Amino acid sequence: MAELATIARPYAEALFKATTGAGVDPVSAAAWLDELAAIADRPELRQLAGNPKVTADQVFALFTQVLKDAARAALPEMAGNFLRTVIANGRINVLTQVAQQFRALLNRRNGFSDAVVYSAFPMDSAALSEVGAALQKRFGRKLNLAVQQDPSLIGGIRVVVGDEVLDSSVKARLEQMKAALTA
């Protein structure tokens, strides 16, 4: 999906520059951008937006109605303008990538990286903070940790930080032993 990422990059960069230039909190902008991306990921909405008989104003109204139904606050003016631009250009399908790239820009500015910790078993907060401290030392930067359970790992953890992977799972060790024995 490099093509979608290429299409999304200018939108993310422009929105990031606009939010920082206008004094808007980029964290709140990332939050409403995530909400818009979640709405845009709905297949029904994509189908409706792709219908040539449906106008851009109708698609925009649908987004705002979904936000109201979810008891969310009204979109800030900047968010509304951004959404109108995305809809007018027929780029609803890249909102998820725009949100990801916007977060990457925000993380880069703040010296953070997103990290996903895959664990075979649920992790309590004490274990997660211990793992987080070790990972921050290992990767040399602050990390925003997200935990996902993956029973296929058998034991241990697998950490993904950007394009770097640290795999200390039992599954990975078994695969290494299998490769060594069959070589």
Swiss-Prot record:
It is found in: Cell inner membrane. Transmembrane segments: none annotated. The keyword Cell membrane applies. InterPro entries: ATP_synth_OSCP/delta_N_sf (IPR026015), ATPase_OSCP/dsu (IPR000711). It is a peripheral membrane protein. The keyword Iron does not apply. Pfam families: OSCP. Signal peptide: none annotated. GO terms for cellular component: plasma membrane; proton-transporting ATP synthase complex. Its main location: membrane. GO terms for molecular function: proton-transporting ATP synthase activity, rotational mechanism. Keywords: ATP synthesis, Cell inner membrane, Cell membrane, CF(1), Hydrogen ion transport, Ion transport, Membrane, Transport. Belongs to the ATPase delta chain family. F-type ATPases have 2 components, F(1) - the catalytic core - and F(0) - the membrane proton channel. F(1) has five subunits: alpha(3), beta(3), gamma(1), delta(1), epsilon(1). F(0) has three main subunits: a(1), b(2) and c(10-14). The alpha and beta chains form an alternating ring which encloses part of the gamma chain. F(1) is attached to F(0) by a central stalk formed by the gamma and epsilon chains, while a peripheral stalk is formed by the delta and b chains. F(1)F(0) ATP synthase produces ATP from ADP in the presence of a proton or sodium gradient. F-type ATPases consist of two structural domains, F(1) containing the extramembraneous catalytic core and F(0) containing the membrane proton channel, linked together by a central stalk and a peripheral stalk. During catalysis, ATP synthesis in the catalytic domain of F(1) is coupled via a rotary mechanism of the central stalk subunits to proton translocation. This protein is part of the stalk that links CF(0) to CF(1). It either transmits conformational changes from CF(0) to CF(1) or is implicated in proton conduction. This is ATP synthase subunit delta. It comes from Verminephrobacter eiseniae (strain EF01-2).
